[in-house]
């Protein structure tokens, strides 16, 4: 996991590695709680959901705890709503056949630093490779909850949806496809699978192919 610092014109000032492990890490979900920054990176290849605490922002992060172990979870995302913390994650229970993009599981707790998370009774709350896997932070716009989700049909990172969450309680969960975003705004783009924004800055990733010769 690395950090990149930008100037006001979005030019890169520096980049620095902040967490390195002998297994794959990606999708760094960052949040603030009790005056500290925390991060949940994807560590599915280690069969864990891990929590890190920042001791010197943004460069120094220390392992805090395992949120869950013996679990193949991808793109874990937290969301605070109605005095509960909700944990969204896609679980691969097929031994790697599904790739961890088909089933969305939901858990909840009173604190993001909780030792135990309660599994939602409707799990998996979504079973659809076109919309199960999270693509960024959930957000509220005009009173409506939106969940960015990856479209993993045909290939990984094909595009993403904005899902409208219409019901989120300890016993119910409902969402509908609101809008699909494809990488069509520039020639030669092949895919996009992450959407986030904060303080007026929107970040969308894309990938393309380049000839090496």
Where are these regions (language model features)?
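Carbohydrate-active catalytic/glycan-binding domains of CAZyme proteins
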Residues: 1-213
């Amino acid at each position: 996991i690395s950090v990149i610092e930008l100037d006001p014109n979005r030019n890169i000032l520096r980049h620095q590695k902040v967490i390195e492990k002998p297994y794959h890490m990606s999708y760094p979900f960052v949040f603030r709680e009790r005056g500290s920054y925390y991060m949940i990176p994807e560590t599915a290849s280690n069969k864990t959901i891990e929590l890190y605490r920042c001791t010197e922002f943004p460069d120094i992060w220390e392992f805090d705890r395992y949120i869950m172990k013996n679990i193949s979870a991808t793109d874990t995302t937290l969301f605070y709503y109605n005095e509960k913390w909700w944990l969204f994650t896609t679980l691969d229970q097929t031994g790697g056949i599904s790739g961890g993009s088909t089933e969305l599981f939901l858990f909840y707790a009173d604190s993001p630093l909780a030792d135990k998370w309660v599994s939602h009774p409707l799990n998996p709350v979504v079973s659809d490779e076109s919309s199960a896997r999270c693509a960024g932070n959930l957000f509220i716009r005009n009173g409506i909850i939106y969940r960015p989700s990856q479209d993993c049909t045909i290939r990984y990172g094909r595009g993403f949806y904005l899902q409208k969450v219409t019901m989120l309680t300890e016993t119910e969960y409902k969402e509908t496809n609101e809008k699909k975003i494809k990488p069509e705004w520039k020639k030669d783009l092949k895919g996009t699978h992450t959407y986030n924004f904060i303080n007026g800055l929107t970040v969308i990733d894309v990938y393309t192919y380049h000839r090496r010769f």
